[in-house]
A protein has these predicted regions:
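Solvent-exposed, non-transmembrane amphipathic alpha-helical segments
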Residues: 52, 133, 174-178
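An amphipathic alpha-helical core segment
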Residues: 162-209
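Short, flexible coil/linker segments at or flanking structured domains
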Residues: 98-101, 145, 181, 189, ...
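Generic alpha-helical structural element
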Residues: 7, 21-24, 143-146, 150, ...
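A surface-exposed partner-binding patch
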Residues: 2-129, 194, 203-236
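Compact, glycine/acidic-enriched structural inserts
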Residues: 134-172
Length: 236
C-alpha cells in the first residue's frame, strides 16, 4: 500500500490511466473523478506492472481483519484500467467467449474501470443510445450473471458502494441491508468512506441497493434493461 509523504505532489495516475482508455465522446463522471482523488489522497492504491489499482479501504488492514465470519472494510472493489493490449482481449472474451474480432461499436461505447467481484465481474462506463455515460455491471457468467445499468449517475454509484455489501456483484443480497439476520459473514462498514460520501456530496446512503438498481441477468429472456438489450444485440 502506498504511503504519501506530507506535502508531496503525486500525479493521479489512477485517473490518468482511466482517461487514456476512454472511447471518444465518453467522460468520467465528476463524482468518480472525486473518488479517485480521495483514493490517491489516502494512499489506498498499489502499483503492479506499471498499472495502478485503487481501493476503498487499505488492503493490508482488510486482509489482517479477515476471519471465517467477519472482516473490516465495507464493499470490496478494485478500480483499475488494464493495459491497452489486454483491453480488447478482455471484452472479446466477455462478449464472445472466443477469439473473434471485437465489434467497433463495443470499443466505442464501453470502458471497464473496476472489478466488482472476486469471480471476475466488472463495472464499466457505457455510452447509451443518447450519448450519456452510465455505469453498468458486467457479470462474469461463472459467478454473478447480473448485467444491467448499475447507476445512472456517478453519485448513485458512490451511494451504492457506501451501503457496504461484501461485493456489489451479488444482486441476491440487494433486497436487504448488509449484515442482515440471514448473513453468516459480517462485513463491518467503511465509516471513513461513508462519511466522505455524505459530507462531500450532501447526500444520504440508501438502506438497500434495490433503491438504486433494478437487476437483470445475462440469461433473461425478455430484458428491459437498456444495457442488457444492447449487449444481446452487439454480441450476436
Amino acid at each position: 500500500m502506498a504511503n504519501l509523504a506530507k506535502g508531496a505532489i503525486v500525479e493521479n495516475l489512477l485517473l490518468a490511466q482511466l482517461r487514456e482508455a476512454l472511447p471518444q465522446g465518453m467522460c468520467v463522471p465528476s463524482e468518480l473523478e472525486a473518488l479517485y482523488a480521495w483514493i490517491e489522497a489516502n494512499g489506498f492504491y498499489d502499483d503492479v506492472g506499471g498499472r495502478r489499482r485503487g481501493y476503498l479501504y487499505p488492503q493490508d488492514r482488510l486482509r489482517q481483519s479477515w476471519s471465517d465470519d467477519e472482516r473490516e472494510g465495507g464493499t470490496d472493489i478494485v478500480f483499475f484500467t488494464d493495459e491497452p493490449k489486454n483491453r480488447d482481449e478482455e471484452l472479446r472474451y466477455w462478449f464472445y467467449g472466443e477469439d473473434r474480432e471485437l465489434a467497433a461499436e463495443i470499443k466505442q461505447r464501453l470502458c471497464v474501470f473496476a472489478g466488482s467481484g472476486s469471480e471476475g465481474s466488472m463495472c464499466a462506463l457505457w455510452l447509451d443510445d443518447a450519448g450519456e455515460t452510465k455505469i453498468v455491471h458486467m457479470g462474469s457468467g461463472s459467478g454473478s450473471t447480473m448485467t444491467c445499468v448499475l447507476a445512472r449517475s456517478g453519485l448513485d454509484f458512490l451511494r451504492l458502494l457506501a451501503i457496504g455489501y461484501d461485493e456489489i456483484c451479488w444482486d441476491e443480497d440487494f433486497s436487504a441491508p448488509p449484515n442482515s439476520e440471514d448473513d453468516d459473514f459480517i462485513v463491518h462498514p467503511n465509516l471513513k468512506f461513508q462519511q466522505w460520501v455524505i459530507e462531500t456530496f450532501k447526500t444520504t446512503i440508501p438502506q438497500t441497493a434495490l433503491e438504486l438498481v433494478t437487476p437483470e441477468h445475462l440469461d433473461d429472456e425478455n430484458p428491459s434493461d437498456e444495457f442488457l438489450i444492447w449487449v444481446n444485440r452487439v454480441a450476436e
